[in-house]
Regions:
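Solvent-exposed alpha-helices and their adjacent loops that cap or buttress functional pockets
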Residues: 2-4, 64-68, 107-109
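Extreme N-terminal starter segment of soluble prokaryotic enzymes
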Residues: 5-9
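Short, structured coil segments at secondary-structure junctions
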Residues: 31, 89-92, 110
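A short beta-strand-loop structural module common to alpha/beta enzyme folds
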Residues: 34-49
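Helix-adjacent hinge/juxtasegments
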Residues: 56, 60-96
């Protein structure tokens, strides 16, 4: 598997997301990242129907499912359609973000392995900041002050990975618990940034 710790990232975009993807791709490559791009390229044929947003989303999702890559960045006009498609693949936890705090929380709290952005709403500069927040942090990063933060959120990830709708329905629409953890919310200590960019890579 190509891992973020080794500065390996999968990227893809449809035609609407292409301009934003290109800006972020160049930015990351300048920082030493190896980018594997499986979407629209400069010379792509606009009539190639394999490059429709949902087909690219499924392509990326399948590469995460097959453990070719640990994480991916994907782009379309809104980020929504390509994210819905990628989410159809088993084990994919995709999120759409339009802010740096959302990108930070997507990885640190939800373990998102596919992050989507929309070129209609996210500027290149904001997109670069979102990419940094996502790629330079890991699950649980920056939440050490919240007791059991990672345990609480890992239960959700595990139950979502194991989710089977027919079993859920047969169980009276109740989730099969794979663990439990108290749900107390904690206030962030005063002066602590909600987005501590922990640039480890």
């Amino acid at each position: 598997m190509k891992k973020v710790a080794d500065k390996q990232i999968l990227m893809a975009a449809d035609f609407a997301g292409y301009p934003l993807k290109e800006e972020i791709k160049k930015y990351l490559e300048k920082k030493g990242w190896t980018v594997t791009d499986v979407g629209v390229k400069a010379d792509s044929d606009p009539n190639d129907t394999e490059l429709m947003f949902h087909r690219i989303g499924l392509r990326v999702g399948s590469m995460i499912t097959e453990k070719e890559f640990e994480r991916a960045l994907i782009f379309c006009g809104t980020g929504m359609g390509i994210h819905i498609a990628a989410s159809k693949c088993p084990g994919v936890h995709a999120g759409v973000v339009e802010s740096v705090p959302a990108a930070f929380r997507a990885i640190t709290g939800n373990g998102v392995n596919v992050l989507a952005m929309g070129a209609f709403y996210v500027t290149p500069e904001l997109g670069k900041q979102c990419a940094d927040a996502y790629l330079y942090n890991d699950f649980g990063s920056g939440w050490e002050w919240w007791p059991d933060f990672d345990k609480f959120h890992q239960i959700a990830i595990d139950e979502l990975n194991a989710f089977n709708y027919e079993e859920y329905k047969a169980n009276g629409f109740k989730v099969k618990h794979l663990g439990d953890c108290h749900c107390e919310l904690y206030d962030r200590p005063e002066g602590l940034s909600p987005v501590p960019l922990m640039c480890k890579r």
